[in-house]
Amino acid sequence: MARKPASSQDFETTLAKLENIVAHLENGDLPLEEALKEFEQGVQLAKLGQERLQQAEQRIQILLQKTEDAPLNDYKGNA
């Protein structure tokens, strides 16, 4: 039975589930209805993974922009 992806799962879990579904589908031994359910869940997981990547990219862009707005000063250690 196909599972619904949890929106709170992390990217690595999503990717592992997607890879598992791809492996099942590549075997080619699933009945049509089960293959369609697996494919549907795979599409949902791919979308969720893409959203996670976009969120990470946005966070990185925000951090980089903050760095550009506040340039780093030379470090003067305890010399």
Curated annotation (Swiss-Prot):
Disulfide bond entries: none
A Gene Ontology BP annotation from the UniProt entry: DNA catabolic process
Cellular component, GO, one term: exodeoxyribonuclease VII complex
Documented EC number(s): 3.1.11.6
Catalytic activity: Exonucleolytic cleavage in either 5'- to 3'- or 3'- to 5'-direction to yield nucleoside 5'-phosphates
Signal peptide: none
Main location: cytoplasm
Sequence similarity: Belongs to the XseB family.
Complex and partners: Heterooligomer composed of large and small subunits.
HAMAP family attached to this UniProt entry: Exonuc_7_S
NCBIfam families in the record: PRK00977.1-1 (NF002137), PRK00977.1-4 (NF002140), xseB (TIGR01280)
Protein name: Exodeoxyribonuclease 7 small subunit
